[in-house]
Protein backbone atom coordinates (compact mmCIF):
# COMPACT_ATOMS: atom_id res chain seq x y z
CA UNK A 1 0.00 0.00 0.00
CA UNK A 2 2.83 2.34 0.82
CA UNK A 3 4.33 1.69 -2.54
CA UNK A 4 1.01 2.31 -4.21
CA UNK A 5 0.55 5.50 -2.25
CA UNK A 6 4.07 6.64 -3.13
CA UNK A 7 3.50 5.91 -6.77
CA UNK A 8 0.19 7.77 -6.61
CA UNK A 9 1.84 10.77 -4.98
CA UNK A 10 4.66 10.71 -7.52
CA UNK A 11 2.17 10.49 -10.35
CA UNK A 12 0.25 13.45 -8.87
CA UNK A 13 3.44 15.51 -8.58
CA UNK A 14 4.40 14.68 -12.13
CA UNK A 15 1.00 15.77 -13.37
CA UNK A 16 1.21 18.95 -11.34
CA UNK A 17 4.72 19.71 -12.60
CA UNK A 18 3.69 19.10 -16.18
CA UNK A 19 0.67 21.34 -15.80
CA UNK A 20 2.81 24.15 -14.45
CA UNK A 21 5.28 23.68 -17.28
CA UNK A 22 2.62 23.87 -19.95
CA UNK A 23 0.92 26.89 -18.40
CA UNK A 24 3.88 29.25 -18.51
CA UNK A 25 4.16 29.51 -22.30
CA UNK A 26 0.47 30.42 -22.35
CA UNK A 27 1.33 33.81 -20.87
CA UNK A 28 -0.49 36.02 -23.32
CA UNK A 29 2.39 38.41 -23.92
CA UNK A 30 5.15 35.81 -23.96
CA UNK A 31 3.47 33.53 -26.47
CA UNK A 32 3.07 36.35 -28.97
CA UNK A 33 6.84 36.85 -28.92
CA UNK A 34 7.47 33.28 -30.02
CA UNK A 35 5.62 33.09 -33.32
CA UNK A 36 3.16 34.51 -35.78
CA UNK A 37 0.33 31.99 -35.81
CA UNK A 38 -2.73 34.10 -36.48
CA UNK A 39 -5.34 31.77 -35.01
CA UNK A 40 -8.22 32.73 -32.75
CA UNK A 41 -6.27 31.89 -29.62
CA UNK A 42 -3.41 34.24 -30.52
CA UNK A 43 -5.78 37.04 -31.49
CA UNK A 44 -7.57 36.88 -28.16
CA UNK A 45 -4.24 36.81 -26.34
CA UNK A 46 -3.17 39.90 -28.25
CA UNK A 47 -6.16 41.84 -26.98
CA UNK A 48 -5.21 41.02 -23.39
CA UNK A 49 -1.58 41.85 -24.01
CA UNK A 50 -2.47 45.28 -25.41
CA UNK A 51 -3.86 46.17 -22.01
CA UNK A 52 -1.08 44.56 -19.96
CA UNK A 53 1.89 45.52 -22.13
CA UNK A 54 4.11 47.92 -20.25
CA UNK A 55 1.72 48.25 -17.29
CA UNK A 56 2.92 45.33 -15.18
CA UNK A 57 6.42 44.09 -14.43
CA UNK A 58 5.07 40.55 -14.17
CA UNK A 59 3.74 40.52 -17.75
CA UNK A 60 6.76 40.16 -20.06
CA UNK A 61 6.13 42.16 -23.18
CA UNK A 62 8.21 43.13 -26.19
CA UNK A 63 6.42 46.14 -27.65
CA UNK A 64 8.35 45.86 -30.89
CA UNK A 65 7.30 42.23 -31.41
CA UNK A 66 3.67 43.02 -30.72
CA UNK A 67 3.73 45.86 -33.21
CA UNK A 68 5.38 43.73 -35.89
CA UNK A 69 2.83 41.03 -35.18
CA UNK A 70 0.01 43.33 -36.24
CA UNK A 71 1.85 44.98 -39.09
CA UNK A 72 2.34 41.49 -40.56
CA UNK A 73 -1.26 40.52 -39.88
CA UNK A 74 -2.52 42.30 -42.99
CA UNK A 75 -0.13 40.27 -45.11
CA UNK A 76 -1.57 37.14 -43.54
CA UNK A 77 -5.10 38.29 -44.43
CA UNK A 78 -4.13 38.97 -48.05
CA UNK A 79 -2.58 35.52 -48.42
CA UNK A 80 -5.62 33.66 -47.09
CA UNK A 81 -9.12 33.22 -48.42
CA UNK A 82 -11.01 34.73 -45.49
CA UNK A 83 -13.27 37.69 -46.27
CA UNK A 84 -13.87 39.23 -42.85
CA UNK A 85 -12.51 39.27 -39.31
CA UNK A 86 -14.95 40.15 -36.56
CA UNK A 87 -13.48 40.26 -33.08
CA UNK A 88 -13.94 42.81 -30.28
CA UNK A 89 -10.56 44.42 -30.90
CA UNK A 90 -10.06 43.92 -34.63
CA UNK A 91 -12.41 44.24 -37.59
CA UNK A 92 -11.20 43.52 -41.11
CA UNK A 93 -12.58 43.32 -44.63
CA UNK A 94 -10.71 41.52 -47.42
CA UNK A 95 -11.88 41.84 -51.03
CA UNK A 96 -10.77 41.10 -54.57
CA UNK A 97 -10.85 44.40 -56.46
CA UNK A 98 -10.65 44.84 -60.22
CA UNK A 99 -7.73 47.03 -61.26
CA UNK A 100 -9.81 48.82 -63.90
CA UNK A 101 -12.42 50.29 -61.55
CA UNK A 102 -14.21 53.28 -63.04
CA UNK A 103 -14.72 55.28 -59.85
CA UNK A 104 -13.29 55.82 -56.39
CA UNK A 105 -14.12 53.21 -53.76
CA UNK A 106 -15.70 54.28 -50.47
CA UNK A 107 -15.78 52.12 -47.34
CA UNK A 108 -17.52 52.63 -44.02
CA UNK A 109 -15.43 52.38 -40.84
CA UNK A 110 -18.14 52.67 -38.22
CA UNK A 111 -17.22 51.77 -34.66
CA UNK A 112 -17.85 48.13 -33.63
CA UNK A 113 -18.66 47.17 -37.22
CA UNK A 114 -16.77 45.31 -39.91
CA UNK A 115 -15.64 47.68 -42.69
CA UNK A 116 -18.02 47.53 -45.63
CA UNK A 117 -18.15 49.03 -49.08
CA UNK A 118 -20.55 51.94 -49.51
CA UNK A 119 -22.49 51.57 -52.73
CA UNK A 120 -23.53 54.35 -55.06
CA UNK A 121 -26.56 56.23 -53.77
CA UNK A 122 -25.85 55.53 -50.09
CA UNK A 123 -25.10 58.34 -47.67
CA UNK A 124 -21.46 59.04 -46.98
CA UNK A 125 -20.49 57.50 -43.61
CA UNK A 126 -19.22 59.59 -40.72
CA UNK A 127 -16.13 57.38 -40.53
CA UNK A 128 -14.77 56.00 -43.75
CA UNK A 129 -11.94 55.60 -46.22
CA UNK A 130 -11.93 56.67 -49.87
CA UNK A 131 -9.54 54.90 -52.24
CA UNK A 132 -8.92 56.69 -55.56
CA UNK A 133 -9.40 54.66 -58.71
CA UNK A 134 -5.93 55.74 -59.87
CA UNK A 135 -4.47 53.66 -57.02
CA UNK A 136 -5.51 50.38 -58.66
CA UNK A 137 -4.68 51.43 -62.21
CA UNK A 138 -1.12 52.38 -61.23
CA UNK A 139 -0.24 49.03 -59.65
CA UNK A 140 2.74 47.29 -61.30
CA UNK A 141 2.17 44.19 -63.37
CA UNK A 142 -0.68 43.25 -65.66
CA UNK A 143 -3.18 42.20 -63.03
CA UNK A 144 -6.89 42.03 -63.58
CA UNK A 145 -7.63 41.97 -59.85
CA UNK A 146 -5.86 42.58 -56.57
CA UNK A 147 -6.52 41.75 -52.93
CA UNK A 148 -7.52 44.68 -50.69
CA UNK A 149 -7.41 44.52 -46.89
CA UNK A 150 -8.93 47.17 -44.61
CA UNK A 151 -8.23 46.62 -40.92
CA UNK A 152 -9.55 48.57 -37.94
CA UNK A 153 -7.53 47.79 -34.83
CA UNK A 154 -8.30 48.77 -31.24
CA UNK A 155 -4.85 49.25 -29.70
CA UNK A 156 -6.18 49.65 -26.15
CA UNK A 157 -4.76 51.69 -23.31
CA UNK A 158 -1.34 50.01 -23.06
CA UNK A 159 1.95 51.05 -24.62
CA UNK A 160 1.55 49.26 -27.94
CA UNK A 161 1.57 51.63 -30.93
CA UNK A 162 2.10 54.63 -28.69
CA UNK A 163 5.66 55.45 -29.73
CA UNK A 164 8.29 57.56 -27.96
CA UNK A 165 6.74 60.90 -28.87
CA UNK A 166 3.29 59.96 -27.64
CA UNK A 167 4.60 58.50 -24.40
CA UNK A 168 6.72 61.58 -23.67
CA UNK A 169 3.95 64.05 -24.52
CA UNK A 170 1.73 63.81 -21.46
CA UNK A 171 -1.96 63.88 -22.26
CA UNK A 172 -1.57 62.97 -25.94
CA UNK A 173 -3.55 60.02 -27.26
CA UNK A 174 -4.80 58.21 -30.33
CA UNK A 175 -8.42 59.05 -31.11
CA UNK A 176 -10.59 56.23 -29.73
CA UNK A 177 -7.39 54.08 -29.54
CA UNK A 178 -8.12 53.14 -33.14
CA UNK A 179 -5.80 52.46 -36.07
CA UNK A 180 -6.90 51.99 -39.66
CA UNK A 181 -4.73 49.76 -41.84
CA UNK A 182 -4.83 49.78 -45.65
CA UNK A 183 -3.02 47.27 -47.85
CA UNK A 184 -3.33 46.39 -51.53
CA UNK A 185 -1.77 43.23 -52.93
CA UNK A 186 1.12 43.21 -50.45
CA UNK A 187 2.69 46.11 -52.33
CA UNK A 188 4.53 49.07 -50.83
CA UNK A 189 2.36 51.84 -52.28
CA UNK A 190 3.95 55.29 -51.85
CA UNK A 191 3.91 58.60 -53.71
CA UNK A 192 0.33 58.18 -54.90
CA UNK A 193 -0.82 60.71 -57.50
CA UNK A 194 -4.14 60.99 -55.67
CA UNK A 195 -4.20 60.66 -51.89
CA UNK A 196 -6.28 58.18 -49.96
CA UNK A 197 -8.74 59.85 -47.61
CA UNK A 198 -9.50 58.53 -44.13
CA UNK A 199 -12.30 60.33 -42.27
CA UNK A 200 -12.46 60.24 -38.47
CA UNK A 201 -15.56 61.54 -36.71
CA UNK A 202 -15.21 62.93 -33.21
CA UNK A 203 -16.70 65.31 -30.71
CA UNK A 204 -15.76 68.95 -30.82
CA UNK A 205 -12.30 69.20 -29.30
CA UNK A 206 -11.14 71.93 -26.89
CA UNK A 207 -9.31 74.79 -28.64
CA UNK A 208 -6.05 73.82 -26.96
CA UNK A 209 -6.07 70.34 -28.55
CA UNK A 210 -4.32 69.84 -31.89
CA UNK A 211 -5.50 67.05 -34.21
CA UNK A 212 -2.81 65.54 -36.43
CA UNK A 213 -3.08 62.82 -39.06
CA UNK A 214 -0.23 60.34 -38.69
CA UNK A 215 0.91 56.92 -39.85
CA UNK A 216 2.98 54.27 -38.12
CA UNK A 217 6.58 54.36 -39.36
CA UNK A 218 7.83 50.79 -39.05
CA UNK A 219 11.48 51.83 -39.39
CA UNK A 220 11.32 54.40 -36.58
CA UNK A 221 8.80 52.57 -34.43
CA UNK A 222 6.94 55.83 -33.96
CA UNK A 223 4.20 57.99 -35.40
CA UNK A 224 5.01 60.29 -38.32
CA UNK A 225 2.99 62.78 -40.36
CA UNK A 226 5.18 62.95 -43.48
CA UNK A 227 3.06 62.58 -46.61
CA UNK A 228 -0.19 63.18 -44.72
CA UNK A 229 -2.22 66.37 -44.51
CA UNK A 230 -4.86 67.15 -41.89
CA UNK A 231 -8.14 68.74 -43.01
CA UNK A 232 -10.22 69.74 -39.97
CA UNK A 233 -13.98 69.96 -40.23
CA UNK A 234 -17.10 70.30 -38.12
CA UNK A 235 -17.16 67.15 -35.98
CA UNK A 236 -14.73 65.27 -38.19
CA UNK A 237 -11.18 65.33 -39.52
CA UNK A 238 -10.08 64.10 -42.95
CA UNK A 239 -6.59 62.62 -43.38
CA UNK A 240 -5.15 62.72 -46.89
CA UNK A 241 -2.06 60.56 -47.34
CA UNK A 242 0.03 59.59 -50.36
CA UNK A 243 0.82 56.05 -49.22
CA UNK A 244 -0.75 52.95 -47.65
CA UNK A 245 -0.04 51.74 -44.11
CA UNK A 246 -1.63 52.04 -40.65
CA UNK A 247 -3.14 55.46 -39.95
CA UNK A 248 -4.52 57.19 -36.87
CA UNK A 249 -5.55 60.61 -35.60
CA UNK A 250 -3.49 62.00 -32.72
CA UNK A 251 -4.93 64.32 -30.09
CA UNK A 252 -2.25 66.53 -28.57
CA UNK A 253 -3.23 69.06 -25.89
CA UNK A 254 -1.16 72.24 -25.82
CA UNK A 255 -2.13 73.43 -22.36
CA UNK A 256 -2.57 71.66 -19.07
CA UNK A 257 -4.49 73.20 -16.18
CA UNK A 258 -1.42 74.70 -14.47
CA UNK A 259 -0.10 76.17 -17.73
CA UNK A 260 -3.46 77.70 -18.61
CA UNK A 261 -3.68 79.31 -15.18
CA UNK A 262 -0.12 80.63 -15.46
CA UNK A 263 -0.79 82.13 -18.88
CA UNK A 264 -3.98 83.72 -17.58
CA UNK A 265 -2.07 85.38 -14.74
CA UNK A 266 0.64 86.58 -17.15
CA UNK A 267 -2.02 88.04 -19.45
CA UNK A 268 -3.81 89.76 -16.58
CA UNK A 269 -0.59 91.22 -15.16
CA UNK A 270 0.65 92.28 -18.59
CA UNK A 271 -2.69 93.86 -19.47
CA UNK A 272 -2.67 95.83 -16.21
CA UNK A 273 0.88 97.07 -16.88
CA UNK A 274 -0.07 97.99 -20.45
CA UNK A 275 -3.10 99.94 -19.25
CA UNK A 276 -0.94 101.94 -16.83
CA UNK A 277 1.59 102.91 -19.49
CA UNK A 278 -1.12 103.56 -22.08
CA UNK A 279 -2.72 105.92 -19.56
CA UNK A 280 0.66 107.67 -19.18
CA UNK A 281 0.87 107.95 -22.97
CA UNK A 282 -2.58 109.52 -23.19
CA UNK A 283 -1.78 111.99 -20.39
CA UNK A 284 1.44 113.01 -22.15
CA UNK A 285 -0.42 113.47 -25.41
CA UNK A 286 -2.99 115.76 -23.76
CA UNK A 287 -0.18 117.74 -22.12
CA UNK A 288 1.63 118.10 -25.45
CA UNK A 289 -1.57 119.22 -27.13
CA UNK A 290 -1.59 122.27 -24.86
CA UNK A 291 2.15 122.95 -24.95
CA UNK A 292 3.27 122.01 -28.47
CA UNK A 293 1.62 123.35 -31.61
CA UNK A 294 2.75 120.39 -33.71
CA UNK A 295 0.53 118.02 -31.71
CA UNK A 296 -2.54 119.98 -32.81
CA UNK A 297 -1.81 119.70 -36.51
CA UNK A 298 0.22 116.55 -37.09
CA UNK A 299 -1.51 113.25 -37.81
CA UNK A 300 1.14 110.80 -36.62
CA UNK A 301 0.61 111.55 -32.89
CA UNK A 302 -3.15 111.36 -33.39
CA UNK A 303 -2.88 107.90 -34.94
CA UNK A 304 -0.58 106.76 -32.12
CA UNK A 305 -3.12 108.06 -29.62
CA UNK A 306 -6.06 106.33 -31.35
CA UNK A 307 -4.15 103.03 -31.26
CA UNK A 308 -3.35 103.61 -27.58
CA UNK A 309 -7.02 104.25 -26.75
CA UNK A 310 -8.18 101.12 -28.59
CA UNK A 311 -5.50 99.03 -26.85
CA UNK A 312 -6.48 100.46 -23.46
CA UNK A 313 -10.13 99.57 -24.02
CA UNK A 314 -9.19 96.11 -25.33
CA UNK A 315 -7.14 95.35 -22.21
CA UNK A 316 -9.93 96.67 -20.01
CA UNK A 317 -12.59 94.48 -21.66
CA UNK A 318 -10.21 91.51 -21.51
CA UNK A 319 -9.74 91.89 -17.75
CA UNK A 320 -13.49 92.24 -17.26
CA UNK A 321 -14.18 89.23 -19.48
CA UNK A 322 -11.66 86.95 -17.76
CA UNK A 323 -12.60 88.12 -14.27
CA UNK A 324 -16.36 87.77 -14.76
CA UNK A 325 -18.35 84.57 -14.59
CA UNK A 326 -19.67 83.23 -17.88
CA UNK A 327 -22.56 81.47 -16.11
CA UNK A 328 -24.82 84.52 -16.09
CA UNK A 329 -27.60 85.37 -18.54
CA UNK A 330 -26.75 84.49 -22.17
CA UNK A 331 -27.50 88.08 -23.23
CA UNK A 332 -24.86 89.40 -20.82
CA UNK A 333 -22.24 87.00 -22.17
CA UNK A 334 -23.24 87.91 -25.74
CA UNK A 335 -22.70 91.63 -25.04
CA UNK A 336 -19.31 91.07 -23.39
CA UNK A 337 -18.11 88.92 -26.29
CA UNK A 338 -19.31 91.47 -28.85
CA UNK A 339 -17.60 94.39 -27.07
CA UNK A 340 -14.36 92.43 -26.69
CA UNK A 341 -14.51 91.44 -30.36
CA UNK A 342 -15.17 95.06 -31.39
CA UNK A 343 -12.16 96.53 -29.60
CA UNK A 344 -9.93 93.71 -30.84
CA UNK A 345 -10.89 94.57 -34.42
CA UNK A 346 -10.34 98.27 -33.68
CA UNK A 347 -6.80 97.46 -32.55
CA UNK A 348 -6.16 95.44 -35.71
CA UNK A 349 -7.53 98.25 -37.87
CA UNK A 350 -5.48 100.99 -36.21
CA UNK A 351 -2.34 98.86 -36.54
CA UNK A 352 -3.10 98.53 -40.24
CA UNK A 353 -3.61 102.30 -40.49
CA UNK A 354 -0.30 102.87 -38.71
CA UNK A 355 1.30 100.84 -41.49
CA UNK A 356 -0.64 102.80 -44.14
CA UNK A 357 0.49 106.13 -42.67
CA UNK A 358 4.06 104.87 -42.51
CA UNK A 359 3.80 103.86 -46.17
CA UNK A 360 2.72 107.37 -47.16
CA UNK A 361 5.54 109.03 -45.23
CA UNK A 362 8.46 106.71 -45.93
CA UNK A 363 7.64 104.96 -49.22
CA UNK A 364 5.29 107.05 -51.31
CA UNK A 365 6.45 110.46 -49.94
CA UNK A 366 4.94 112.57 -52.75
CA UNK A 367 1.25 113.26 -53.49
CA UNK A 368 0.20 112.19 -50.02
CA UNK A 369 -2.28 114.94 -49.21
CA UNK A 370 -5.82 113.85 -48.34
CA UNK A 371 -8.54 116.19 -47.18
CA UNK A 372 -9.84 115.45 -43.67
CA UNK A 373 -7.28 112.67 -43.50
CA UNK A 374 -7.53 111.74 -39.81
CA UNK A 375 -11.33 111.99 -39.84
CA UNK A 376 -11.50 109.46 -42.67
CA UNK A 377 -9.11 107.13 -40.85
CA UNK A 378 -11.22 107.38 -37.70
CA UNK A 379 -14.45 106.58 -39.53
CA UNK A 380 -12.79 103.50 -41.03
CA UNK A 381 -11.10 102.30 -37.83
CA UNK A 382 -14.10 102.76 -35.52
CA UNK A 383 -16.84 102.07 -38.06
CA UNK A 384 -15.74 98.96 -39.99
CA UNK A 385 -15.50 96.77 -36.84
CA UNK A 386 -19.11 97.72 -36.01
CA UNK A 387 -20.29 96.14 -39.27
CA UNK A 388 -18.24 92.99 -38.64
CA UNK A 389 -19.58 92.62 -35.09
CA UNK A 390 -23.16 93.10 -36.28
CA UNK A 391 -22.63 90.37 -38.88
CA UNK A 392 -21.12 87.97 -36.33
CA UNK A 393 -23.83 88.72 -33.79
CA UNK A 394 -26.65 88.20 -36.27
CA UNK A 395 -25.38 84.66 -36.93
CA UNK A 396 -25.46 83.88 -33.18
CA UNK A 397 -21.69 83.36 -33.09
CA UNK A 398 -21.05 84.67 -29.57
CA UNK A 399 -21.28 82.53 -26.44
CA UNK A 400 -19.25 80.72 -23.80
CA UNK A 401 -15.75 79.74 -24.95
CA UNK A 402 -14.21 76.92 -22.91
CA UNK A 403 -10.59 75.79 -22.78
CA UNK A 404 -10.00 72.34 -21.29
CA UNK A 405 -6.89 70.46 -20.26
CA UNK A 406 -5.90 66.92 -21.25
CA UNK A 407 -8.08 65.48 -18.48
CA UNK A 408 -11.10 67.34 -19.88
CA UNK A 409 -11.20 69.73 -16.92
CA UNK A 410 -12.24 73.31 -17.56
CA UNK A 411 -9.17 75.55 -17.24
CA UNK A 412 -10.68 78.80 -18.53
CA UNK A 413 -14.10 80.09 -19.52
CA UNK A 414 -14.83 83.45 -21.08
CA UNK A 415 -17.40 85.04 -23.34
CA UNK A 416 -16.14 84.78 -26.88
CA UNK A 417 -16.98 82.84 -30.07
CA UNK A 418 -18.85 79.57 -29.91
CA UNK A 419 -18.69 79.00 -33.70
CA UNK A 420 -15.26 78.42 -35.22
CA UNK A 421 -16.08 79.50 -38.82
CA UNK A 422 -17.05 82.97 -37.60
CA UNK A 423 -13.88 83.14 -35.49
CA UNK A 424 -11.68 82.23 -38.45
CA UNK A 425 -13.39 84.68 -40.80
CA UNK A 426 -13.82 87.74 -38.56
CA UNK A 427 -10.70 87.47 -36.39
CA UNK A 428 -8.04 85.33 -38.07
CA UNK A 429 -8.84 86.47 -41.59
CA UNK A 430 -9.27 90.12 -40.57
CA UNK A 431 -5.94 90.13 -38.76
CA UNK A 432 -4.13 88.30 -41.55
CA UNK A 433 -4.96 91.07 -44.04
CA UNK A 434 -3.69 93.84 -41.76
CA UNK A 435 -0.67 91.80 -40.68
CA UNK A 436 0.52 91.02 -44.20
CA UNK A 437 0.16 94.67 -45.26
CA UNK A 438 2.03 95.85 -42.16
CA UNK A 439 4.79 93.27 -42.67
CA UNK A 440 5.40 94.40 -46.26
CA UNK A 441 5.51 98.08 -45.28
CA UNK A 442 7.78 97.39 -42.31
CA UNK A 443 10.18 95.39 -44.50
CA UNK A 444 10.43 98.27 -47.01
CA UNK A 445 10.95 100.84 -44.26
CA UNK A 446 13.56 98.69 -42.52
CA UNK A 447 15.43 98.36 -45.81
CA UNK A 448 15.47 102.16 -46.12
CA UNK A 449 16.59 102.64 -42.52
CA UNK A 450 19.50 100.22 -42.80
CA UNK A 451 20.65 101.30 -46.28
CA UNK A 452 20.18 105.08 -46.11
CA UNK A 453 23.05 105.82 -43.68
CA UNK A 454 25.64 104.02 -45.80
CA UNK A 455 24.38 105.67 -48.98
CA UNK A 456 24.40 109.21 -47.57
CA UNK A 457 27.75 108.80 -45.83
CA UNK A 458 29.37 106.93 -48.69
CA UNK A 459 30.45 104.20 -46.30
CA UNK A 460 29.59 100.59 -45.74
CA UNK A 461 28.89 100.99 -42.03
CA UNK A 462 26.42 98.58 -40.46
CA UNK A 463 23.13 99.50 -38.83
CA UNK A 464 23.34 101.33 -35.51
CA UNK A 465 21.53 100.40 -32.34
CA UNK A 466 19.22 103.36 -32.94
CA UNK A 467 18.15 101.94 -36.30
CA UNK A 468 17.37 98.62 -34.67
CA UNK A 469 15.32 100.31 -31.95
CA UNK A 470 13.43 102.28 -34.58
CA UNK A 471 12.45 99.12 -36.45
CA UNK A 472 11.45 97.41 -33.20
CA UNK A 473 9.30 100.41 -32.27
CA UNK A 474 7.64 100.47 -35.67
CA UNK A 475 7.03 96.71 -35.50
CA UNK A 476 5.15 97.22 -32.23
CA UNK A 477 2.99 99.92 -33.82
CA UNK A 478 1.99 97.78 -36.80
CA UNK A 479 1.40 94.64 -34.69
CA UNK A 480 4.23 92.35 -35.75
CA UNK A 481 4.24 90.58 -32.37
CA UNK A 482 0.73 89.32 -33.11
CA UNK A 483 2.17 87.44 -36.07
CA UNK A 484 3.64 84.82 -33.72
CA UNK A 485 0.23 83.17 -33.73
CA UNK A 486 0.26 82.96 -37.55
CA UNK A 487 3.83 82.32 -38.67
CA UNK A 488 5.21 80.04 -35.96
CA UNK A 489 4.28 76.51 -34.84
CA UNK A 490 1.78 76.57 -32.00
CA UNK A 491 3.98 75.24 -29.22
CA UNK A 492 4.14 75.99 -25.52
CA UNK A 493 7.15 78.31 -25.83
CA UNK A 494 5.43 80.24 -28.62
CA UNK A 495 2.32 80.68 -26.50
CA UNK A 496 4.36 82.08 -23.61
CA UNK A 497 6.24 84.54 -25.86
CA UNK A 498 3.04 85.56 -27.64
CA UNK A 499 1.22 86.14 -24.34
CA UNK A 500 4.07 88.16 -22.83
CA UNK A 501 4.79 90.38 -25.84
CA UNK A 502 1.20 91.20 -26.69
CA UNK A 503 0.13 91.85 -23.12
CA UNK A 504 2.99 94.38 -22.86
CA UNK A 505 2.32 96.13 -26.17
CA UNK A 506 1.14 99.22 -24.29
CA UNK A 507 4.54 99.46 -22.56
CA UNK A 508 6.31 99.24 -25.92
CA UNK A 509 4.15 102.00 -27.39
CA UNK A 510 4.87 104.23 -24.38
CA UNK A 511 8.63 103.72 -24.82
CA UNK A 512 8.31 104.48 -28.54
CA UNK A 513 6.32 107.63 -27.77
CA UNK A 514 8.99 108.83 -25.32
CA UNK A 515 11.88 108.11 -27.72
CA UNK A 516 10.11 109.74 -30.66
CA UNK A 517 8.91 112.92 -28.98
CA UNK A 518 11.62 113.38 -26.32
CA UNK A 519 14.77 113.41 -28.48
CA UNK A 520 18.12 113.92 -26.79
CA UNK A 521 20.56 116.56 -27.93
CA UNK A 522 22.65 114.02 -29.78
CA UNK A 523 19.59 112.61 -31.45
CA UNK A 524 18.50 116.07 -32.56
CA UNK A 525 21.88 116.80 -34.05
CA UNK A 526 22.14 113.42 -35.71
CA UNK A 527 22.05 113.25 -39.47
CA UNK A 528 21.33 109.54 -39.61
CA UNK A 529 18.58 108.10 -41.73
CA UNK A 530 16.73 107.08 -38.59
CA UNK A 531 16.40 110.65 -37.43
CA UNK A 532 15.16 111.65 -40.84
CA UNK A 533 12.59 108.91 -40.80
CA UNK A 534 11.39 110.05 -37.38
CA UNK A 535 11.06 113.53 -38.77
CA UNK A 536 9.16 112.24 -41.78
CA UNK A 537 6.88 110.32 -39.48
CA UNK A 538 5.75 113.63 -38.01
CA UNK A 539 4.91 115.41 -41.30
CA UNK A 540 1.36 116.79 -41.41
CA UNK A 541 -1.14 115.36 -43.84
CA UNK A 542 -3.69 118.11 -43.49
UniProtKB/Swiss-Prot annotation:
The keyword Signal applies. Disruption phenotype: No visible phenotype. Mutant mice show altered follicular-versus-marginal zone B-lymphocyte fate decision in the spleen and decreased numbers of B220+ lymphocytes in the bone marrow. Adgrg3 deficiency reduces inflammatory responses in the kidney after renal ischemia-reperfusion injury or hypertensive nephropathy. Adgrg3 knockout does not impact overall metabolic phenotypes in high-fat diet-fed mice, but influences immune cell activity. The Stachel sequence (also named stalk) in the C-terminal part of the extracellular domain (ECD) functions as a tethered agonist. In the inactivated receptor, the Stachel sequence (also named stalk) is embedded in the GAIN-B domain, where it adopts a beta-strand conformation. On activation, the Stachel moves into the 7 transmembrane region and adopts a twisted hook-shaped configuration that forms contacts within the receptor, leading to coupling of a G-alpha protein, which activates signaling. Adhesion G-protein coupled receptor (aGPCR) for glucocorticoid hormones such as cortisol, cortisone and 11-deoxycortisol. Ligand binding causes a conformation change that triggers signaling via guanine nucleotide-binding proteins (G proteins) and modulates the activity of downstream effectors, such as adenylate cyclase. ADGRG3/GPR97 is coupled to G(o)/GNAO1 G proteins and mediates signaling by inhibiting adenylate cyclase activity. May also signal through G-alpha(q)-proteins; additional evidence are however required to confirm this result in vivo. Residues 289-302, 364-372, 448-467, 516-542 are cytoplasmic. It is found in: Cell membrane. Belongs to the G-protein coupled receptor 2 family. Adhesion G-protein coupled receptor (ADGR) subfamily. Residues 1-18 form the signal peptide. GO terms for biological process: B cell differentiation; cell surface receptor signaling pathway; G protein-coupled receptor signaling pathway; negative regulation of CREB transcription factor activity; negative regulation of non-canonical NF-kappaB signal transduction; regulation of cell migration. One of its GO terms (molecular function) is G protein-coupled receptor activity. The keyword Disulfide bond applies. Residues 19-267, 324-342, 394-426, 489-494 are extracellular. Heterodimer of 2 chains generated by proteolytic processing; the large extracellular N-terminal fragment and the membrane-bound C-terminal fragment predominantly remain associated and non-covalently linked. Interacts with PRTN3; this interaction induces the activation of PAR2. Interacts with GNAO1 (when palmitoylated). It comes from Mus musculus. It is a multi-pass membrane protein. Residues 107-257 form the GAIN-B domain. This is Adhesion G protein-coupled receptor G3. Autoproteolytically processed at the GPS region of the GAIN-B domain; this cleavage modulates receptor activity. Cortisol binds at residue 502. The chain crosses the membrane at residues 268-288, 303-323, 343-363, 373-393, 427-447, 468-488, 495-515. Forms a heterodimer of 2 chains generated by proteolytic processing that remain associated through non-covalent interactions mediated by the GAIN-B domain. In the inactivated receptor, the Stachel sequence (also named stalk) is embedded in the GAIN-B domain, where it adopts a beta-strand conformation. On activation, the Stachel moves into the 7 transmembrane region and adopts a twisted hook-shaped configuration that forms contacts within the receptor, leading to coupling of a G-alpha protein, which activates signaling. GO terms for cellular component: plasma membrane. Residues 213-257 are annotated as: GPS.
